[in-house]
Amino acid sequence: MARLCTHTESGHYLMALDAGTGSVRAVIFDLQGKQIAVDQAEWQHLAVPDVPGSMEFDLAKNWQLACQCIRQALQKAAIPATAIAAVSACSMREGIVIYDSNGEPIWACANVDARAAHEVSELKELHDNTFEEEVYRCSGQTLALSAIPRLLWLAHHRPDIYHRASTVTMISDWMAFMLSGELAVDPSNAGTTGLLDLVTRNWKRSLLQMAGLRSDILSPVKETGTLLGHISQKAAEQCDLQAGTPVIVGGGDVQLGCLGLGVVRPAQTAVLGGTFWQQVVNLPAPVTDPNMNVRINPHVIPGMVQTESISFFTGLTMRWFRDAFCAEEKLIAERLGIDAYSLLEDMASRVPPGAHGVMPIFSDVMRFKRWYHAAPSFINLSIDPEKCNKATLFRALEENAAIVSACNLQQIAAFSGVQADSLVFAGGGSKGKLWSQILADVTGLTVHVPVVKEATALGCAIAAGVGVGVWPSLAETGEKLVRWDREHKPNPENFAVYQQAREKWQAVYQDQRALVDGGLTTSLWKAPGL
């Protein structure tokens, strides 16, 4: 049972459940948006033997982990379950859950599941090789991460699952279903299936029919911040929440993260610096890229969409560099009681802008239709240890992440006509003051860094609060609750240096991709079906 105490009144807190790629969290906020308690548990996705690229989502075990986090968060907050006014859930996007006619979840895959490479290729050939273009025009998605090839894979290889399927939702919706017994999806997350119409914010059943798939398995669509149901007695017994507590429709992690950052108005722009880096720009109305380079997702704000570009493995590349080459710096940082990245940034701050011409080759700009990258490498190294050392390479990596972001933002501006005048930098990368300044210098934009740098759970809590009338609207509340840590103005001289570096990098990267095309090097990552 939930632990009782006397220092709180009923309904003065909100709970957000955040199902990420690598972990699940239960986070409790007060009504001023302050985080009160959090509990987190890592989870592992299941590779199926003899199914290359498979990454199944363990429904039974992961629900147990979610319940564990809920119980522990309540205990850490020292509040009774009756103090929770509402609960909402968010998750990684693209991952799907399938239910049978009895409402039982019977199969799920994580966002990174890539088993359907053959099906992607097969689908691209439909309708005189125009099917993917039709999917993109309607939904803003290509087939690489879509639910359509995964459903086709099930029809081909797991007909026992496919023919029992009654409903499909996203992982955030599954968590809400496990709490309430009610099934629905929201546009921001369901939009990443490639089956949702950007204009109507509802399903486009004809896309499934065009692919020869069933169109009778789509859940009702409800907007973020609306009432889904209430905590069931069964869920209350499993996770110690109070039966009858409202469960509010949540959404996709990036869109709710933008809500938590106050990125809720047209033309507002954010760079989210995590394992992947996302460059997100709000558009006032749906529009897609004629070149299909970037994805378009429904925002949690009704009527608004977000263009989203992705830089691959940016945060992971920095971690690889730290762990592979900077053992000494890690030891020194530990002795000094500081983060190793802070020490590396201090070293890199003494390297001039442009990093002596060193060009990292890791993530390409986003090319959603034909998405692959060159082989990881550093180009234009020097054997002068004063100019080419760990500090130089670290700075070069930070500069390169900013250059890729700037290129992606330029692609968005080219087709949308929306030009950012500043940007919000959040996520783990924004903790670096040097990195934040480099991003300002490369883009030529003022960079705003929030106090709360991981804002997805806060955005989810805002949805919960709006759903029970604690706050009036999503957009107004997102703007009200965001607090700013610092601001970085671009340096015009550095901007000029980086413009030249950017042009050189783009030319060199094109040649490096050609080496992959020729089979001489191995791509950092390729989308399924390439």
UniProtKB/Swiss-Prot annotation:
Its EC number is 2.7.1.189. CDD domains: ASKHA_NBD_FGGY_AI-2K. GO terms for biological process: carbohydrate metabolic process; quorum sensing. The keyword Transferase applies. GO terms for molecular function: autoinducer-2 kinase activity. SUPFAM superfamilies: Actin-like ATPase domain. It is found in: Cytoplasm. InterPro entries: AI-2_kinase, ATPase_NBD, Carb_kinase_FGGY, FGGY_C, FGGY_Carb_Kinase, FGGY_N. Its main location: cytoplasm. GO terms for cellular component: cytoplasm. Keywords: Cytoplasm, Kinase, Transferase. Disulfide bonds: none annotated. The keyword RNA-binding does not apply. It catalyses: (S)-4,5-dihydroxypentane-2,3-dione + ATP = (2S)-2-hydroxy-3,4-dioxopentyl phosphate + ADP + H(+). PANTHER family: AUTOINDUCER-2 KINASE, SUGAR KINASE. Belongs to the FGGY kinase family. Catalyzes the phosphorylation of autoinducer-2 (AI-2) to phospho-AI-2, which subsequently inactivates the transcriptional regulator LsrR and leads to the transcription of the lsr operon. Phosphorylates the ring-open form of (S)-4,5-dihydroxypentane-2,3-dione (DPD), which is the precursor to all AI-2 signaling molecules, at the C5 position. This is Autoinducer-2 kinase. It comes from Salmonella paratyphi A (strain ATCC 9150 / SARB42).
